[in-house]
């Protein structure tokens, strides 16, 4: 005759099952959310029927002479998002993919755009991430976990290094930071896609609570966020950020002989307000050392200077006369905190 189980044993087993089911649902929801995010990116990357011209909360349509604007074509999937103000000129050689990550809601951006990436399929590396900063992207949501994932929807297995979900010896450095996307969980989680990452030294990308040191890249990101916090409801900051991957002299190494580690990182920044346009850029070598005492002003340059250093034509969708003026002019006095 079997010995009846005590109530305590039954309770323990039921509690164990409850915990297991809770964990299962937790990860199931994560993967479901990830799949939905990637499907959103795929749908709008490949489709050319949507209207993406202009800015998130500005009309921004190019209505003046513009010889170097991005033109939707078969090569880029007739993607009208490439006409947005934050976009630089697309690379015309090699195999590239422009991936536009979108949200299911258009409450934050009229086209639902979160951020966009130019991915070099030959180098298996991201060249840049571009995005907008305005009141619509700011909120109270903060990252819950470091849930990094590959974009297996938009990239084939031979277009990214699948064995490097972790960057040995380096941080997985966000190019569009999760801290710039706090209005919703959806937009924040999207920033953890690996196409938005570059290998960065922790002393460049991180911080030390004990010593109070902050990485130079983190300080630049924090300063950019402070500028965005001061925007009025109708102002926008347009950003294009990335690391150098196109020249061997601008690469530190390749992890495992494969994954590129950029030697330099940059930010091209364009602010549109009631006073008009203002532009500036950051350029810095990535080093494995705290540089807390270095001023941000030391690394601030004009957009025109950054274009010479990177070979990238930033904010090409602006009218030519506006672009020329804003890129050559850098006035530190209008950028508080430098």
Regions picked out by a protein language model, each given a short descriptive name:
Residues 48-338:
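Domain-level detector for secreted/extracellular nuclease and nuclease-toxin modules, and
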Residues 33-41:
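Hydrophobic helical h-region of N-terminal Sec-dependent signal peptides
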Residues 42-46:
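C-terminal motif of bacterial Sec signal peptides marking the signal peptidase cleavage site
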Residues 22-33:
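Bacterial N-terminal signal peptides that target proteins for export
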Residues 2-20:
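Short, Lys/Arg-enriched N-terminal segments with co-localized hydrophobic residues
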